[in-house]
Amino acid sequence: MIAQIPFWQRKRLADMTQPEWESLCDGCGKCCLQKLEDEDTGEVYHTDLVCRYMDLDTCGCTVYEQRLKKVPGCTVLTADTVLSYHWLPYTCAYRTLAEGRPLPDWHPLRSGDPDTVHQARVSVRGNVVSEDSVPEEDWEEHIIHWIL
């Protein structure tokens, strides 16, 4: 009977296998947004600029297996650190489960369809551009507030 309960409802984040952990990612792409931090206040601002390695259609990483070598500052979420990333969006499955909330209906694990995150307009698809298209000195002009 316990096997009929989805793993994300019966396991703690720390007890999940690597494949289970990876499958929690809904593919929204929000963690790949470039962020700016105010040096005085520490406040983090999201931009509509994404990592150069994001596929703008699927919102997936084109170099996922090599991402940490190619992008040294790439975010690595773990069960121990997920809640320390205060900038993670409310919709993030890792944050959702860490806070004890259920996965939403549009999450691919619930819907069985990886496109539901896009259909629900939760992903960044259609709202972002590659960081390569904007000089870094102009990134402040790309601060957004629709992320949360």
UniProtKB/Swiss-Prot annotation:
Pfam families associated with the record: CxxCxxCC
Transmembrane segment boundaries: none
Record InterPro entries: Puta_zinc/iron-chelating_dom, UCP006173
Family statement: Belongs to the UPF0260 family.
Protein name: UPF0260 protein Maqu_1608
Species assigned in the record: Marinobacter nauticus (strain ATCC 700491 / DSM 11845 / VT8)
